[in-house]
């Protein structure tokens, strides 16, 4: 794991706006063009797009529409789609790391026992779950539980998904780029 000792703006920016290899961008563009040849690509076409690129379904199904659309529409924004797809590729290349750390969080807050039928990557962590983990490790309650979720979700939700968690790890430098 390539852990950095401090988080720099450059590190966060590298994950938020990854450098896209030309061959990857070409393949994304090709699949996008196939989906939008005679019309604008919409969110309804995302599943097929991601399947055509052979991306991991348990990851891409967590992508939120608002992260890839032109605001106020259901039309896909190509720039956002490229960024999102590249981030998904980074996450897919680091599934073992993300799975191990996510599993540890799920176990330590008790969600694995409370919701045994839920697949690992389908769990969500709430503020309450993170507070349980903070108590378990003896961290001060004011240690930023809400701030952590707010950072992971850009302040949009009070729970964190597997995808959110993977993105936080990427921003912190725990994932191989």
Curated annotation (Swiss-Prot):
There is a cross-link at residue 19 (Glycyl lysine isopeptide (Lys-Gly) (interchain with G-Cter in ubiquitin)). Pfam families: Rad33. The modification N-acetylserine is found at residue 2. Keywords: Acetylation, DNA damage, DNA repair, Isopeptide bond, Nucleus, Ubl conjugation. It comes from the Eukaryota. One of its GO terms (cellular component) is nucleus. It is found in: Nucleus. One of its GO terms (biological process) is nucleotide-excision repair. Its main location: nucleus. InterPro entries: Rad33 (IPR014841). Present with 1080 molecules/cell in log phase SD medium. Involved in nucleotide excision repair (NER) of damaged DNA. Required for the repair of RNA polymerase I-transcribed rDNA and RNA polymerase II-transcribed DNA regions. May have a role in stabilizing the DNA repair proteins RAD4 and RAD34. This is DNA repair protein RAD33.
């Amino acid at each position: 794991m390539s852990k950095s000792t401090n988080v720099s703006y450059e590190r966060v920016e590298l994950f938020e706006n990854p450098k896209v290899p030309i061959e990857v961008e070409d393949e994304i563009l090709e699949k996008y063009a196939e989906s939008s040849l005679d019309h604008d690509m919409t969110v309804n076409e995302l599943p097929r797009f991601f399947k055509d690129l052979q991306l991991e379904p348990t990851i891409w199904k967590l992508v939120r529409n608002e992260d890839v659309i032109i605001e106020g529409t259901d039309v896909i924004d190509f720039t956002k789609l490229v960024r999102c797809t590249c981030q998904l590729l980074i996450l897919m290349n680091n599934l073992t790391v993300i799975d191990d750390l996510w599993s540890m969080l799920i176990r330590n807050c008790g969600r694995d026992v409370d919701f045994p039928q839920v697949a690992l990557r389908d769990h969500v962590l709430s503020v309450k779950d993170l507070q349980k983990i903070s108590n378990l490790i003896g961290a001060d309650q004011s240690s930023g539980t809400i701030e952590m979720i707010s950072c992971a979700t850009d302040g949009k939700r009070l729970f964190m998904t597997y995808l959110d968690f993977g993105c936080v790890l990427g921003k912190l430098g725990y994932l191989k780029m």
